[in-house]
Amino acid sequence: MLSIFKNLLGTSEEDGTTQEANSKDTKGLKEERKRKKRKNKYKIPPGHTQQDWDALVASGKNLSGVESPISVTAEELAKHCSPDDCWMAIRGKVYNVTAYLPYHPVGPKKILKHSGVDATKPYLKHHDWVNEEELLKTSFVGYLV
C-alpha cells in the first residue's frame, strides 16, 4: 500500500527522490547547455551585419577577383581554400566568398570547411531558402566545368 502512495506522489523507492526533483535537475542541465551554447556563439564583428553585406553588394564593388566570368575546373577550385583566398561552387557556379567570411552569421569556419569544393549539397542542406545568386552576385567567379 505504501508503494502505491509513493508512486502517486512521484517518489522513487530506490533512492527516495521525487519526480519533481528529477525534473528540476533536468531543467538545470538544459539551462546549463543553453548557457554554454550561447557563450560559444560566433560574435559578428562590428560593421559586418547582413545589412552591411547587402550595402557592400549594392555598391557594385567587384568582389570576385576576376574581371569577367571564367571557367573553373575542380583542380583550380581546390587551390582556393584558405581564409585569404576562399572559393566555393554552388549549383555549378563558383563564388569567391573571401570577403563574405566575416559576415557569415555562424562564422567563417563553416564556410572554410566547404571551400575549394562543390559545396552544393551542404549549402542546400542548411540554406535552401537563401538566394545565393543574389547574395553573392558581386562575388561570382565563373562556372564549374
Swiss-Prot record:
Gene Ontology annotations for the cellular component aspect, listed alphabetically: cytoplasm
Q: Chief localization class?
A: cytoplasm
Q: Which UniProt keywords apply?
A: Cytoplasm, Heme, Iron, Metal-binding, Phosphoprotein
Pfam (any one):
Cyt-b5
Q: Domain of life, per the record?
A: Eukaryota
Spell out the Basic and acidic residues composition-biased ranges.
Answer: 22-32
**Where's the Cytochrome b5 heme-binding domain?**
69-145
- As stated in the Swiss-Prot or TrEMBL entry, residues carrying the post-translational modification Phosphoserine are 68
Which portions of the sequence form the region Disordered? 1-49
Binding-site positions, heme: 104, 127
Report the InterPro entries cross-referenced here.
Answer: Cyt_B5-like_heme/steroid-bd, Cyt_B5-like_heme/steroid_sf, Cytochrome_b5/Flavoprotein_Rdt
**Location in the cell:** Cytoplasm
Here the segments flagged for biased composition (Basic residues) are 33-42
Q: Does this UniProt record's set of keywords contain Iron?
A: yes
Q: Which terms does the record give in the GO molecular function aspect?
A: cytochrome-b5 reductase activity, acting on NAD(P)H; heme binding; metal ion binding
State the family it belongs to.
Belongs to the cytochrome b5 family.
Name this polypeptide is given: Uncharacterized heme-binding protein C330.03c
Native source species: Schizosaccharomyces pombe (strain 972 / ATCC 24843)
Phylogenetic placement of the source organism: Eukaryota, Fungi, Dikarya, Ascomycota, Taphrinomycotina
